[in-house]
């Protein structure tokens, strides 16, 4: 099995506003990056976050392997009008490990679309983040989404929610 890690929107512009547990999430995402066979960075481009701008760039504290691939998107769905499906097919991957930001927008949408496309998914429960919202905290959103993803019913398409350490243990097994 190819250890494919998809890192969503971990960009300077996304983190211009505070996100829950930035430091801890970065540490865990770096652990996944360091042990993955292939890393795909999804980068959102919109408004001030134009492709190539400083705000569009990946957070400087994230590891960026030489063979990493970058896919630019303009919607919450990482597959919408992007080459992501083609990139994954060229890599021969059928199973994706997902992490990144924002839990309740781009991460959630990408997970649901990927599952509907038939990819087997592992979600790093402690390696995605978001911001507090008007009526709910980031921690509550993260916990709620982990629960929803674990229970999501898409027949024949497996979604597993695990901690980073559990994922790494599986990868190193």
Where is each model-derived feature located?
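Active-site flanking residues adjacent to catalytic metal/cofactor-binding acidic residues
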Residues: 8, 42, 125
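Short acidic, Gly/Ser-rich segments with clustered Asp/Glu that frequently serve as metal-coordination loops
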Residues: 11-17
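Active-site-adjacent betaalpha module
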Residues: 2-4, 28-31, 38, 49-173
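Extreme N-terminal tail/first-helix region
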Residues: 1-2, 12
């Amino acid at each position: 099995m190819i250890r494919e890690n998809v890192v969503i929107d971990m960009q300077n512009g996304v983190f211009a506003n505070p996100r829950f547990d930035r430091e801890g999430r970065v540490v865990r995402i770096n652990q996944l990056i360091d042990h993955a066979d292939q890393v795909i960075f999804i980068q959102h481009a919109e408004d001030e976050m134009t492709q190539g701008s400083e705000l569009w760039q990946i957070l400087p504290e994230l590891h960026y392997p030489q063979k990493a691939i970058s896919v630019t998107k303009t919607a919450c769905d990482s597959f919408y009008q992007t080459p992501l499906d083609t990139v994954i097919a060229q890599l021969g991957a059928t199973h994706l490990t997902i992490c990144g930001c924002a839990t309740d927008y781009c991460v959630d949408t990408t997970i649901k679309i990927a599952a509907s496309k038939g990819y087997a998914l592992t979600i790093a429960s402690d390696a995605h983040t978001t911001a507090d919202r008007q009526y709910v905290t980031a921690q509550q959103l993260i916990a709620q989404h982990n629960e929803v993803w674990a229970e999501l019913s898409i027949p024949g398409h497996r979604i597993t929610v695990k901690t980073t350490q559990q994922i790494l243990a599986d990868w190193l097994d």
